[in-house]
């Protein structure tokens, strides 16, 4: 790693075979921290998110109008490489020789088919850190099974907890595992491996099981079963340690507020904000244990009050008093949030096809090294000639020969 750097990962090169959600989110963070992330795709097998809604102006023709893809692939360079072509491997090998990190989230065995598994990469570049983010890890009886976020939500136990008591689980509405835990754990692994390489000069495998990462989202469920044999089911908005704890109606069109009270001092504060109504003196609500026991009755009382208040005023009043509260917001309100704007969370980048587009940066801020959104998501092959002719040392004639043989598509 260089001694004098503008951004934290300046000089780090990433050979990025990842696609869809978890992998591209992780490599996007690396790119925003300064790494040169080179995404490998082919028009024959593009990242499937290129066809994922929402599309700019609702027009989904082509492969460059997906906001979903754009959000996960800003700051990257992209080369077109048909890995099914016999000559594609030689290009990939040259890139791996220059790379610090080689990452994929394919099903186990795919990289080996291209002779680019860990054993191969280790011979090509002993300093390379080889990152694999398969569904259930690289070994074990289920290692070769495929899956997506919705399957992980189910397998890890998250779906079983989503919903309300007495009803069938109804899912989470989004693939939390793809968006949060899997890329986060992957990034921890990458940074630890980079640090260890500083001492040894050698790369290693960072093998992540997306299922195991996802299980870390619901630690209370396996612990409850291990402790007392209880299989936890849907719990709605409730929390075993808090009351009130839920989402309540407020004044206005489709408005709600989330309120959480974890101890008796917070309850006393909430009572003051409510104006100390007589019902709050009920002995059923005197302690946190009693409030949990009578949560349904308490929620009904709380909502009777919140329904007479405007959510924005109520959130500010509760937060200033010391009660955790959050107004339920939609995407427009999040984009217009003054706090997020001042922190520079949102960035606008100009894309050659869809024009100026909104992106969110990685949710970290360093005191010295910037985390930046510099370039919009790339088109397939946008940087092929730039990377091959510059970084990889191919001559103009060699690039033309590869193009003529349909390797660079």
From Swiss-Prot:
GO biological process, one term: toluene catabolic process
UniProt pathway annotation: Xenobiotic degradation; toluene degradation
Catalytic residues, chain numbering: 178
EC identifiers of the protein: 2.8.3.15
Induction remark: Induced by toluene.
One Pfam match: CoA_transf_3
Record keywords, A-Z: Aromatic hydrocarbons catabolism, Transferase
GO molecular function list: succinyl-CoA:(R)-benzylsuccinate CoA-transferase activity
Activity regulation statement: Inhibited by (S)-benzylsuccinyl-CoA.
Transmembrane segments: none
Signal peptide as annotated in the record: none
Catalysed reaction equations from the record: (R)-2-benzylsuccinate + succinyl-CoA = (R)-2-benzylsuccinyl-CoA + succinate
Family named by the database record: Belongs to the CoA-transferase III family.
Self-association state and partner proteins as the record states: Heterotetramer composed of 2 BbsE subunits and 2 BbsF subunits.
PANTHER family attached to this UniProt entry: SUCCINATE--HYDROXYMETHYLGLUTARATE COA-TRANSFERASE
Role according to the record: Catalyzes the reversible conversion of (R)-2-benzylsuccinate to (R)-2-benzylsuccinyl-CoA. Inactive with (S)-benzylsuccinate.
Protein name: Succinyl-CoA:(R)-benzylsuccinate CoA-transferase subunit BbsF
Native source species: Thauera aromatica
């Amino acid at each position: 790693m260089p001694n004098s750097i503008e951004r934290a990962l300046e000089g780090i090169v990433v050979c990025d075979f990842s696609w869809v959600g978890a992998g591209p989110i992780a490599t996007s963070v690396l790119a925003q921290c300064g790494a040169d992330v080179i995404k490998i795709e082919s028009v024959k097998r593009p990242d499937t998110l290129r066809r994922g809604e929402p599309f700019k102006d609702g027009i989904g023709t082509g492969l460059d109008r997906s906001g979903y893809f754009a959000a996960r692939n800003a700051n990257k360079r992209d080369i077109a490489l048909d890995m099914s072509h016999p000559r594609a491997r030689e290009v990939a090998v040259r890139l791996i020789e220059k790379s610090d990190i080689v990452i994929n989230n394919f099903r186990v065995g795919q990289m080996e088919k291209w002779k680019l598994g860990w054993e191969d990469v280790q011979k090509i570049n002993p300093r390379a850190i080889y990152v694999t983010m398969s569904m259930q890890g690289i070994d074990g009886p289920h290692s070769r099974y495929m899956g997506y976020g919705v399957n992980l939500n189910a397998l890890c136990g998250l779906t079983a907890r989503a919903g309300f008591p007495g009803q069938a689980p109804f899912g989470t509405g989004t693939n939390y595992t793809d968006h949060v835990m899997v890329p986060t754990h992957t990034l921890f692994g990458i940074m630890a491996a980079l640090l260890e390489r500083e001492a040894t000069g050698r790369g290693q495998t960072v093998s992540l099981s997306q299922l195991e990462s996802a299980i870390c989202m619901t630690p209370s469920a396996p612990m409850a079963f291990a402790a007392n044999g209880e299989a936890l089911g849907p719990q709605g908005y409730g929390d075993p340690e808090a009351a009130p704890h839920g989402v309540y109606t407020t004044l206005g069109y489709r408005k709600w507020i989330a309120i959480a009270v974890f101890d008796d001092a917070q309850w006393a504060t909430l009572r003051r904000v409510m104006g100390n109504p007589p019902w709050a003196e009920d002995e059923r609500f005197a302690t946190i244990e009693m409030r949990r026991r009578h949560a349904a009755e308490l929620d009904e009382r709380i909502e009777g009050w919140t329904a007479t208040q405007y959510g924005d005023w109520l959130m500010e009043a509760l937060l200033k008093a010391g009660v955790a509260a959050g107004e339920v917001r939609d995407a427009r309100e999040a984009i217009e949030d003054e706090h997020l704007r001042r922190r520079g969370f949102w960035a606008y980048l100009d894309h050659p096809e869809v024009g100026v587009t909104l992106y969110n940066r990685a949710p970290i801020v360093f005191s010295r090294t910037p985390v930046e959104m510099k370039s919009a998501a790339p088109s397939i092959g946008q940087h092929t000639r730039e990377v091959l002719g510059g970084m990889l040392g191919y001559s103009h004639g060699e690039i033309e020969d590869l193009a003529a043989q349909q390797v660079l598509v």
